[in-house]
Regions:
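Left-handed beta-helix
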Residues: 1-10, 198, 206-336
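Unchanged
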Residues: 1-253
């Protein structure tokens, strides 16, 4: 069956996010007022015509399970296929691993039977911590046209030293993969990979047979000369949420009209869990300047350059600037 199948990884801890992920895995982190981080890559997949998506989870999954539910908000609640939540444990435990997976290949090994029943010819692998609006159909077109074994989405925008970086030749082929380098150079990987279903199964089964677990090391680096891996350069807005500071900076960028226009373009809408909150009330004496405000808020004070999630209440006489207020936060009168 032609088309693409989506696999999203949402497991492991990100120490840089601190208390933001104390009770959740990073994919369910609230972002932009109405969304969770996972909504963006999930919407990218749906907008590309992907109707089957598996989400591999491990750890504090309750928030993610509650948010995704049956997948109805993304039109993925289906009798055949649709959204599958995959809290996988068996393979890692059989290798004596306690806690998080050692790597993506081990996580995929946990759901090997699921992979064997994929109906589509191509599979898109992605982390859940990326905020972007990527036209995956273009990635597929480039992948087929190039004849590559795997296409890796990357960007020329600078990242962090711990990220993965690719060097490309003039044909777009990845000739070197490096990570944990002091001075990053090349193209930063966005951790979105497109490859054939049969090749994916072959790679996973080979790693399982040899107790290998790292996608970055055992696939990107070890197989780079044997197979053809191409880079697809995407220089649109792309934010990987890895730290509290990064979360704040990337969130506040949403207050820029050009960023909102790119991220929330009507051609590729971003879907989120439906809610039935009442409309936001802004008192005649209240002040709202350059802010994103979700439904169900009560604004009687002053807010400037802020992002408000649902149910936030700002009492009369309160002044809030340059802040992100999470769900049901109350700012008392006189606070500033």
């Amino acid at each position: 069956m032609k088309g693409m199948h989506g696999i999203i990884f949402s497991y492991g801890e990100k120490p840089g996010l601190g208390q933001l992920t104390a009770n959740r895995i990073h994919g369910s982190l609230p972002f932009g007022g109405d969304y969770r981080v996972v909504d963006f890559i999930l919407s990218n997949m749906v907008n590309a015509g992907i109707t089957d998506v598996g989400v591999i989870m491990h750890g504090k999954c309750q928030s993610m399970l509650d948010h995704l539910g049956t997948g109805k908000s993304w039109d993925l609640s289906r009798k055949t296929g649709g959204l599958k939540l995959l809290p996988a444990f068996a393979y890692s435990e059989s290798r004596g691993v306690v806690g998080a997976f050692r790597g993506k290949m081990e996580a995929l090994g946990c759901v090997i039977e699921y992979l064997r029943h994929i109906r589509q010819d191509y599979v898109v692998l992605s982390d859940s911590d990326l905020v972007t609006n990527l036209p995956l159909t273009r990635v597929l077109e480039a992948h087929i046209a190039s004849g590559a074994d795997m296409t890796c989405v990357c960007t020329s925008h600078p990242g962090e030293s711990g990220d993965t970086y690719f060097k490309l030749d003039n044909t777009g082929r990845i000739v070197d993969t490096a990570y944990d380098i002091r001075t990053p150079e090349g193209y930063q990987s966005l951790n979105i990979f497109l490859l054939g279903r049969d090749l994916l199964l072959e790679l996973v089964e080979d790693c399982m047979a040899h107790d290998r677990y790292s996608f970055r090391h055992n696939v990107l680096q070890d197989k780079g000369k044997e197979l053809r891996f191409n880079g697809y350069v995407w220089d649109g807005f792309a934010a990987r949420i890895n730290s509290v500071q990064g979360y704040y900076q990337r969130s506040m960028e949403l207050l820029r009209p050009e960023i909102r226009a790119e991220l929330f373009c009507p051609q590729r809408p971003v879907y989120a869990k439906e809610n039935d909150a009442a409309s936001t009330y802004i008192d005649p004496s209240g002040e709202c300047v350059n802010s994103l405000i979700s439904d169900g808020c009560d604004i009687q004070g002053s807010i400037r350059n802020c992002i408000l999630f649902r149910g936030v209440r700002v009492e009369k006489g309160a002044h809030v600037e340059n802040s992100i207020l999470f769900k049901n936060t109350v700012v008392r009168s006189g606070a500033s």
